[in-house]
UniProtKB/Swiss-Prot annotation:
Name of one Pfam family that matches: SAICAR_synt
Name of this protein: Phosphoribosylaminoimidazole-succinocarboxamide synthase
Stored PANTHER family: PHOSPHORIBOSYLAMINOIMIDAZOLE-SUCCINOCARBOXAMIDE SYNTHASE
Pathway linked to the protein: Purine metabolism; IMP biosynthesis via de novo pathway; 5-amino-1-(5-phospho-D-ribosyl)imidazole-4-carboxamide from 5-amino-1-(5-phospho-D-ribosyl)imidazole-4-carboxylate: step 1/2
Lineage: Bacteria, Pseudomonadati, Pseudomonadota, Gammaproteobacteria, Alteromonadales
Transmembrane segments: none
One GO cellular component term: cytoplasm
Natural source organism: Shewanella baltica (strain OS223)
GO terms for biological process, alphabetical: 'de novo' IMP biosynthetic process
Cited InterPro entries: SAICAR_synt/ADE2_N, SAICAR_synthase_Vibrio-typ, SAICAR_synthetase_CS
Catalyzed reactions: 5-amino-1-(5-phospho-D-ribosyl)imidazole-4-carboxylate + L-aspartate + ATP = (2S)-2-[5-amino-1-(5-phospho-beta-D-ribosyl)imidazole-4-carboxamido]succinate + ADP + phosphate + 2 H(+)
Amino acid sequence: MSLADSVLAINNDLPIRTDSPVHSGKVRSVYWLTDADSRRLITTKGYNVPEDTPLAIMVISDRISAFDCIFHGEGGLKGIPGKGAALNAISNHWFKLFAENGLADSHILDIPHPFVWIVQKARPIKVEAICRQYITGSMWRAYSKGERVFCGITLPEGLEKDQKLPELLITPSTKGILTGIPGVPAQDDVNISRSDIEANYQAFGFEKLADIDLYEKLLKDGFKVISKALADIDQVFVDTKFEFGYVTDKDGNSKLIYMDEVGTPDSSRIWDGAAYRDGKILENSKEGFRQFLLNHFPDPDVLLNKDRMPEREALARDNDLPLEAMMQVSRTYTGVAEKVTGAPIPLPANPKADIIKILKDEYDLIV
């Protein structure tokens, strides 16, 4: 098997039995199971959900996206070796830690394979729940240009790049393009304030006003749990993005849960603790790949300027990145995962074949 064969780049063509179109995201693909298969698995596997809950198979890929584009490497390498397994392993670890600390559940019901989750259908909150402990990235870029109000929060004068903020800040943005909300542009990833959410909580997917407090509590509590665990391995949890949604429990009650992934190098910035104390920033997250791209291409404005999206898409499509750059990202992701979980990350030689075999033999979901 070649290195390219070990990468799962295309994850929306598995022969999983479904009666709905496969939903393909930047990294994961979702296969909604038939009602009959959902009910069968809930019964035979003993999932603790109502018997009529829709289930899905969520398959992660090794693709890497940055600046809203998918990048690829030399030698036909269409993704990062080990990336998908590393992301899932990290999320699985944090979700388990959340449960041990009495926080909310996640949407995951079963983990058949390192690349695969079986999840319950949730009603998503249309908010990217972003939490920041340090001033860097887009917040620093805005601050350095003189902006002091960020998502309705007034920042103090005198802050310096990459310093720890006086308090943990929640700086949400829109998830997807939302229309008809006063004061909120119909664009993806628009910064919003808590007052925006309060005034339009139902449009953002909240079932009741009090759940805004709950989502903020779950966001901050989850951040603190991960931050403490990362500090124990001398890593700095800088900022992150969580997602939330509602599910219905066996008693018919609606409850707020964590969705998607949490605390990964894709959804977070993680810095090396020793380097930070020495006044340096050593990225253990996708931010390192973003910085590589900005330095690799002669005109970094293409990657930053939303008005140049067609050029950016062509740049990503037409350029094979150096193999060493792709492998450096692989080492970052698998290294963080192994530190977090305390276990090596399995790298199957042919993940697609493995997934099909398990879903056929143990779940009877392959057609």
